[in-house]
Amino acid sequence: KGEQTQKLTKPDEKYVNKALKKEDILIEKYGSMNNYYDKAHIDCKVLKDMNIYVSASGHLMPCCWVAGQLYKWWEKPGQNQIWRFIDNVGGLDELSVLKHGFKKVLEGDFFNNIKSSWKKSSCTGGDGKLKVCSVKCGTEFDPFGAQFEEVNT
């Protein structure tokens, strides 16, 4: 009793995700991370690799990051930005490969609308750039990709 058995500390510098070191630079350049996301050039990871995501319920999405926006525990379903894109194509059922088949869903407006949004100047508003795309596939800030870079030992 009374002895310290666990201590949570910062990791050694060599284990810190290198992309996180760019965050302060981006904030200085853009004023905030949200401003960066508004301006981010998107290089879609899954489009490059020709990947796609099918949910357990049979809904076709561009990637797991977009699919993960559907049901955030802190938001009521339908509040997240992705729902505007879904509602614009007639609802979630329009993305069901079980009802419509893979080809029809893939060639529908949902995927094209997301890709077209990347040219928008802001992530805000009903027809803004899909923010999750800026967060995960913005070219100046990629903590996901950086985690796979080799650590110098």
Residue ranges: model-predicted function:
Residues 1-104, 113-115, 142-151:
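Radical SAM enzyme [4Fe-4S]-AdoMet core and its adjacent flexible, acidic
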Residues 106-125:
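C-terminal structured domain segments
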Residues 119-153:
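Cysteine-cluster motifs in flexible loop/terminal segments that predominantly coordinate metals
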